């Protein structure tokens, strides 16, 4: 990776020592910051097949200095406002608090159950701001940390936890009128559908379809993770793909874009179904029903009446709810497209 700082429009002296930029006797300066990495897609080695990040960073920096601060600000606002200004959300009795900072209002809201409609409005729009700011890069959706992180190695590596976190990042996207910001999820799921075929074969012995565990990254890692004494309550889970493709169905459901359904959502949903059709087994207590086993409920465990504490079991509600929803929507998709009638039946 590479970060470049370039200074322009200053009346003082500029010098550099080691990794420090010094500005002396300066009354005004425009500092341009450019970040680039060698990331070149989920299936490209960042060193052997990486993007020319040094060249790209230098080119961007040389290009940016042709713009003044005001010009860059206006360009940014034009890009941002075309998304943000789509929604005007108002609640009755909402009043702006000129005295307390937002963090104090949050504490009073959470700890003392204060009624604060204005804070609820603000939080809704803050969520939209975060998604606008962190869901632009093809194939790289908003992750656990968002656009900025306080450390080089951010918590949980800044990856994607797909046993709820990534999905819930995008639950507001359609209803909050930010539909096109789902596109980075499409790219990630396409990558997972490729790596997930190897996952299905190597870990579960299933040669049809694809699946992924609870965690992935920009390289579309799909295998289960966890070593040593780490818990099966999160590592032993094969439903990540089945749940994540529901985000794609939601996008179709809101937009009614049949080209998107035909070319993107439906093939990925069907691939997830193919795996599940081979993963389901007959319930040993009721052969008329199909269940999953082994099964876990995301990051949960249970205690029996005899005091046994465990995580793995037969036919958990979460698994079956995800599967039922996916099967139902895949059948709907086949009907809309007029294809795969026998498969749907």
PLM segments and residue spans:
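Alpha-helical support elements that line or immediately flank enzyme active sites
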Residues: 130-133, 166-179, 242, 248-258
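The feature captures the catalytic groove of carbohydrate-active enzymes
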Residues: 41-50, 55, 143-159, 208-263, ...
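Extended, well-ordered alpha-helical scaffold segments
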Residues: 123-126, 181-192, 260-276, 326, ...
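Hydrophobic (often cysteine-bearing) scaffold residues that line and stabilize catalytic clefts
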Residues: 119-123, 165, 182, 240, ...
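Acidic/polar, glycine-enriched structural segments that form the non-catalytic walls/loops
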Residues: 1-160, 178-201, 334-338
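Extended, hydrophobic/aromatic-rich amphipathic alpha-helical segments that build helical scaffolds
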Residues: 120-134, 241-250, 266-267, 271-276
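Conserved aromatic-histidine-acidic binding/catalytic patches
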Residues: 21, 68, 111-119, 157, ...
């Amino acid at each position: 990776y590479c970060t470049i700082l370039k200074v322009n429009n200053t009346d003082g002296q500029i010098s550099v020592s080691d990794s420090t930029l010094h500005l002396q006797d300066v009354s005004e300066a425009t500092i341009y910051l450019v970040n680039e990495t060698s990331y070149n897609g989920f299936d490209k080695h960042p060193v052997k097949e990486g993007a020319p990040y040094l060249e790209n960073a230098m080119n961007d920096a040389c290009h940016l200095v042709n713009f003044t601060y005001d010009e860059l600000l206006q360009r940014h606002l034009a890009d941002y406002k075309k998304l943000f200004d789509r929604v005007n959300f108002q609640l009755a009795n909402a009043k702006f608090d000129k005295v307390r900072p937002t963090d104090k209002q949050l504490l009073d809201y959470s700890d003392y159950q204060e009624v604060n409609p204005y804070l609820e409005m603000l939080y809704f729009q803050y969520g939209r701001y975060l998604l606008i700011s962190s869901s632009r890069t093809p194939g790289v959706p908003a992750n656990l940390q968002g656009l900025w992180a306080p450390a080089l190695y951010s918590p949980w590596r800044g990856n994607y936890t797909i046993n709820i976190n990534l999905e819930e990042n995008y639950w507001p996207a359609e209803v909050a009128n930010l539909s096109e910001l789902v596109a980075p999820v499409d790219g990630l799921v396409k990558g997972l559908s490729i790596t997930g075929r190897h996952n299905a074969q190597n870990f579960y012995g299933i040669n049809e379809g694809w699946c992924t565990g609870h965690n992935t990254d920009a390289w579309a890692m799909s295998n289960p993770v966890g070593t040593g004494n780490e818990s099966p309550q999160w590592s032993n889970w094969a439903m990540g793909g089945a749940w994540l493709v529901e985000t794609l169905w939601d996008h179709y459901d809101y937009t009614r874009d049949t080209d998107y359904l035909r070319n993107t959502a439906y093939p990925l949903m069907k691939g997830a179904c193919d795996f599940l059709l081979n993963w389901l087994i007959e319930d040993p207590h009721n052969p008329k029903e199909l269940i999953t086993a082994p099964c876990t409920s995301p990051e949960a465990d249970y205690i029996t009446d005899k005091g046994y504490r465990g995580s793995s079991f037969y036919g958990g509600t979460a698994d079956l709810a995800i599967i039922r929803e996916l099967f139902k929507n895949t059948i709907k998709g086949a009907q809309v497209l007029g294809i795969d009638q026998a498969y749907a039946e």
